Swiss-Prot record:
Lineage of the organism: Bacteria, Pseudomonadati, Pseudomonadota, Betaproteobacteria, Burkholderiales
Name assigned to this protein: Urease subunit gamma
Subunit structure: Heterotrimer of UreA (gamma), UreB (beta) and UreC (alpha) subunits. Three heterotrimers associate to form the active enzyme.
Pfam families according to UniProt: Urease_gamma (PF00547)
GO biological process, one term: urea catabolic process
Pathway(s) it belongs to: Nitrogen metabolism; urea degradation; CO(2) and NH(3) from urea (urease route): step 1/1
Disulfide bonds: none
Enzyme Commission identifier(s): 3.5.1.5
One cellular component (GO) term of this entry: cytoplasm
Top-level taxon: Bacteria
Database matches in InterPro entries: Urease_gamma, Urease_gamma/gamma-beta_su, Urease_gamma_sf, Urease_subunit
Keyword annotations of the record: Cytoplasm, Hydrolase
Compartments in which it is found: Cytoplasm
UniProt organism field: Burkholderia cenocepacia (strain HI2424)
Amino acid sequence: MKLTPREKDKLLIFTAALLAERRRARGLKLNYPEAVAFITAALMEAARDGKTVAEVMHYGTTLLTRDDVMDGVPEMIPDIQVEATFPDGTKLVTVHHPIP
Protein backbone atom coordinates (compact mmCIF):
# COMPACT_ATOMS: atom_id res chain seq x y z
CA MET A 1 0.00 0.00 0.00
CA LYS A 2 1.48 3.30 -1.07
CA LEU A 3 0.38 6.28 0.98
CA THR A 4 1.30 9.94 0.79
CA PRO A 5 2.65 11.65 3.92
CA ARG A 6 -0.73 13.36 4.35
CA GLU A 7 -2.55 10.02 4.17
CA LYS A 8 -0.14 8.56 6.73
CA ASP A 9 -0.86 11.51 9.04
CA LYS A 10 -4.61 10.92 8.69
CA LEU A 11 -4.18 7.25 9.59
CA LEU A 12 -2.08 8.14 12.63
CA ILE A 13 -4.73 10.62 13.79
CA PHE A 14 -7.46 8.05 13.27
CA THR A 15 -5.57 5.38 15.19
CA ALA A 16 -4.90 7.70 18.12
CA ALA A 17 -8.53 8.86 18.06
CA LEU A 18 -9.77 5.28 18.11
CA LEU A 19 -7.62 4.56 21.15
CA ALA A 20 -8.91 7.74 22.83
CA GLU A 21 -12.50 6.78 22.05
CA ARG A 22 -12.04 3.35 23.63
CA ARG A 23 -10.39 4.79 26.73
CA ARG A 24 -13.12 7.40 27.10
CA ALA A 25 -15.77 4.67 26.77
CA ARG A 26 -14.08 2.84 29.67
CA GLY A 27 -14.38 5.98 31.79
CA LEU A 28 -10.74 7.06 31.61
CA LYS A 29 -9.85 10.74 31.36
CA LEU A 30 -8.03 11.63 28.16
CA ASN A 31 -4.54 13.10 28.14
CA TYR A 32 -3.33 15.84 25.77
CA PRO A 33 -2.50 13.73 22.67
CA GLU A 34 -5.65 11.65 23.07
CA ALA A 35 -7.87 14.72 23.37
CA VAL A 36 -6.30 16.40 20.34
CA ALA A 37 -6.60 13.22 18.25
CA PHE A 38 -10.21 12.65 19.36
CA ILE A 39 -11.29 16.17 18.39
CA THR A 40 -9.22 16.28 15.19
CA ALA A 41 -10.63 13.01 13.86
CA ALA A 42 -14.19 14.10 14.65
CA LEU A 43 -13.64 17.38 12.78
CA MET A 44 -12.25 15.56 9.75
CA GLU A 45 -15.20 13.16 9.69
CA ALA A 46 -17.74 15.98 10.08
CA ALA A 47 -16.20 17.76 7.10
CA ARG A 48 -16.26 14.55 5.09
CA ASP A 49 -19.95 14.13 6.01
CA GLY A 50 -20.69 17.42 4.25
CA LYS A 51 -21.05 19.87 7.14
CA THR A 52 -20.08 23.49 6.51
CA VAL A 53 -16.91 25.04 7.94
CA ALA A 54 -18.99 26.98 10.49
CA GLU A 55 -20.83 23.82 11.55
CA VAL A 56 -17.56 21.92 11.94
CA MET A 57 -16.05 24.74 14.00
CA HIS A 58 -19.04 24.77 16.35
CA TYR A 59 -19.13 20.97 16.53
CA GLY A 60 -15.50 20.99 17.68
CA THR A 61 -16.47 22.79 20.88
CA THR A 62 -19.10 20.19 21.82
CA LEU A 63 -17.04 16.99 21.72
CA LEU A 64 -15.26 17.02 25.08
CA THR A 65 -15.79 18.67 28.45
CA ARG A 66 -13.39 19.29 31.32
CA ASP A 67 -14.74 16.13 32.96
CA ASP A 68 -13.56 14.06 29.97
CA VAL A 69 -9.89 15.07 30.22
CA MET A 70 -7.08 15.11 32.77
CA ASP A 71 -6.43 18.24 34.83
CA GLY A 72 -4.68 20.97 32.86
CA VAL A 73 -5.46 19.56 29.41
CA PRO A 74 -8.04 22.24 28.43
CA GLU A 75 -5.46 24.98 29.10
CA MET A 76 -2.92 23.13 26.94
CA ILE A 77 -5.25 23.27 23.92
CA PRO A 78 -6.12 26.91 23.18
CA ASP A 79 -7.08 25.94 19.63
CA ILE A 80 -6.97 23.09 17.15
CA GLN A 81 -6.29 23.55 13.45
CA VAL A 82 -6.89 20.83 10.89
CA GLU A 83 -6.97 20.69 7.11
CA ALA A 84 -10.23 18.89 6.44
CA THR A 85 -11.65 17.62 3.17
CA PHE A 86 -15.05 19.13 2.42
CA PRO A 87 -17.19 18.28 -0.62
CA ASP A 88 -15.89 21.43 -2.32
CA GLY A 89 -12.22 20.98 -1.42
CA THR A 90 -9.73 21.06 1.43
CA LYS A 91 -10.05 23.89 3.95
CA LEU A 92 -8.31 24.88 7.16
CA VAL A 93 -10.62 24.65 10.16
CA THR A 94 -9.70 26.36 13.44
CA VAL A 95 -11.56 25.60 16.65
CA HIS A 96 -10.82 28.05 19.47
CA HIS A 97 -11.13 26.70 23.04
CA PRO A 98 -12.28 23.22 21.98
CA ILE A 99 -12.69 22.10 25.60
CA PRO A 100 -14.79 24.77 27.33
